[in-house]
Curated annotation (Swiss-Prot):
GO biological process annotation, one example: lipopolysaccharide biosynthetic process
Family note: Belongs to the UDPGP type 2 family.
Keywords tagged on the record: Lipopolysaccharide biosynthesis, Nucleotidyltransferase, Transferase
Reactions catalysed according to its record: alpha-D-glucose 1-phosphate + UTP + H(+) = UDP-alpha-D-glucose + diphosphate
Pathway annotation: Carbohydrate metabolism; nucleotide-sugar metabolism; Bacterial outer membrane biogenesis; lipopolysaccharide biosynthesis
Protein name as annotated: UTP--glucose-1-phosphate uridylyltransferase
């Protein structure tokens, strides 16, 4: 079993969530009582990963600080006997988990962001998890499905893995996947035959699959990233590098289990907030009642 590191690219400026993200990193926007990035780290840790690399930007100090120890806050909570809150704060970065930071100086695309992590990851296989797509842990056990299953399959086969989901409507804003065989059941796997970032004419592709921001990548991806020219929006795209890799070796797509929310966009963020809010143990029942009252006004 390989000791894989996970890379989370958090250097993006969160354009879809402006003006909220003008001064607050998108990844720190709360979903009930935890910032978005915390759900991502929790998912990675549940998959058995102990080393996480955040690719940050000068404006993302809040993300770095979130995972640092706050001795003053912990001391205050201890003095006030807020044991539950203290435990929650201390578990933000679980024991045995290391979170490192590297900087992306220029916004040259997701592929470039991943390359910025290479000095820390080394010429080794690794994981990429995008910070704004949250997989609902109530609909899929993170200890068994999705990223955890992708890691297990990579350890078994050595083949790169990409998580996919079905998407209705316009796919021109997404990374579209076409597979050799149909993915007709959650967790099913098939080889990728085409992978296109934000296709101009998605209707010409015989596919309704899009990438869900989870990748387990073989070490061969590094060479492809180095060779990748700027693509969609003039950026170096991870999708383009994976597409080239898929021409040379098998790259698998795995159909996602459960539900996901694109919290980098307003609708997905609002859906996730409501879903997690309704499940909140302390306030969920009152929140549900409040929503029902609003809907009947």
């Amino acid at each position: 079993m390989m000791n894989l590191k996970a890379v989370i690219p958090v250097a993006g400026l969160g354009m879809h969530m402006l003006p909220a993200t003008k001064a607050i990193p998108k990844e720190m926007l709360p979903i009930v009582d935890k910032p978005m990035i915390q759900y991502i780290v929790d998912e990675i840790v549940a998959a058995g990963i102990k080393e996480i690399v955040l690719v940050t930007h000068a404006s993302k100090n809040a993300v770095e600080n979130h995972f640092d120890t706050s001795y003053e806050l912990e001391s205050l909570l201890e003095q006030r006997v807020k044991r539950q809150l203290l435990a929650e704060v201390q578990s933000i970065c679980p024991p045995g988990v290391t979170i490192m930071n590297v900087r992306q100086a220029q916004p040259l695309g997701l592929g470039h962001s991943i390359l910025c992590a290479r000095p820390v990851v080394g010429d080794n296989p690794f994981i990429v998890v995008l910070p704004d797509i949250i997989i609902d842990d109530a609909t899929a056990d993170p200890l068994r499905y999705n990223l955890a299953a992708m890691v297990a399959r990579f350890n078994e086969t050595g083949r790169s893995q990409v998580l996919a989901k079905r998407m209705k409507g316009d796919l021109s804003e997404y990374s579209v996947i076409q597979t050799k065989e149909p993915l007709d059941n959650e967790g099913k796997v098939s080889r990728i035959v085409e992978f296109i970032e934000k296709p101009d004419q998605p209707q010409t592709l015989d596919s309704d699959l899009m990438a869900v921001g989870r990748y387990v990548l073989s070490a061969d991806i590094w060479a492809e990233l180095e060779r990748t020219e700027p693509g969609a929006w003039g950026r170096i795209q991870l999708t383009d590098a994976i597409a080239e890799l898929a021409k040379k070796q098998s790259v698998d797509a795995m159909l996602m289990t459960g539900d996901s929310y694109d919290c980098g966009k307003k609708m997905g963020y609002m859906q996730a907030f409501v879903k997690y809010g309704l499940r909140n143990l302390k306030e969920g029942a009152k929140f549900r009642k409040s929503i029902e009252q609003l809907l009947h006004e």
